[in-house]
Amino acid sequence: IGRPQWDPIYEMIDAPPLSNTPAPRQGLPGPLQQTPDLDAWIRINADETITVFTGKVEIGQGIKTAVAQLAAEELDVALSRIRVVAVDTELSPDEGTTAGSMSVENSGSSVRQAAAEARHHLLNLAHEELEAECTPGALAVEDGLITDLLSGRQTSYWTLFGGQRFGRPITGTVHPKRFDAHNLVGQAAKRLDL
């Protein structure tokens, strides 16, 4: 007695990748390879705050505080100016699972790179706006206030850019600050999740 032969319900086929799935970008940390859009990570708000987006869930590990510190450090703003939006499927980048103590390593390195590139772009805009006598990298930034130390002229992130979109990819060509230049990272901060 043989077994009855059934027609398969599903058939496996090789489907082409979805057209909106970006190819990974080499040289970028973790999740930035799949989501290299700067606007997916950082927003300069007109109300003089900065929104940072993460795809990691706050489950007591302090990820909101850590990414806020990293962003504030790279952008040279007070920690109190940073707003963290975590795991909003409409807004946040898809960073996969929150597990294995990898949130700061993955999301943190991505936010750090995104913030460094946002700062670089803002300093280039300020250099033009101020008709600065120094290079963009020599402009001083303190809590979002940008100063050309040679002329004394000033502007801020919010005057330059508040409410706008970057409309550019993260390239990986901008280097974040050296660790010995950090003032916020590695220091105690009030937890944002408590």
What does each model-identified segment do?
Residues 1-194:
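Cofactor-binding beta-sheet edge motifs in enzyme active sites
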